[in-house]
Amino acid sequence: ALANIYYDKKKYSEAEEWYSRAYKNGIIDAAFDIGNMYFNVEAYEHCLYWYEKAAKEGHLKAQNNMGVSYFKLREYKKAEKWLVEASDSNLPIACFNLGVLYTVLRDEESACRYYKKGSTMLEENCKYNLAIINQNNKNEKDAISLYKYLHKIGNDKGCFNIGLIM
């Protein structure tokens, strides 16, 4: 709790000191928190160090964030490794991030596979991106179905796009 107070006051060295103490006492989330602190100031090399400590202990969000950090560093193979690991453990946001990675790599088939997987876990952004792909591929029936779902749950982008199609 003290680490969070320092973090909120942007006293990062003090926050890191207290998070480190917590980590040394067996609190894996503390390594994740330090990773987030560095991620938020775009110090990706530092955040990776801390995320890896948590990720190797099975912390799914740390695995996902390692993938995102590597993505930002354009180290796509490393990003893929960590995102696949988190996605294989059914973390919905990892499915979305993996879909984005495959979209950037122009592997639409793999992107769709992970967007579909995330969609089954009700990850809105997966449904939206899958709808866009369906729309771009002239599969309006599936696109409309996804946009209707997004409209029903109040997703603004889904509401806007269904209006464009219909």
Segments and roles (model prediction):
Residues N25-I27, E57-H59, S89-L91, M121-E123, ...:
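Short helix-capping/linker turns of helical repeat alpha-solenoids
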Residues Y114-L122:
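TPR/TPR-like (Sel1-like) alpha-helical repeat modules
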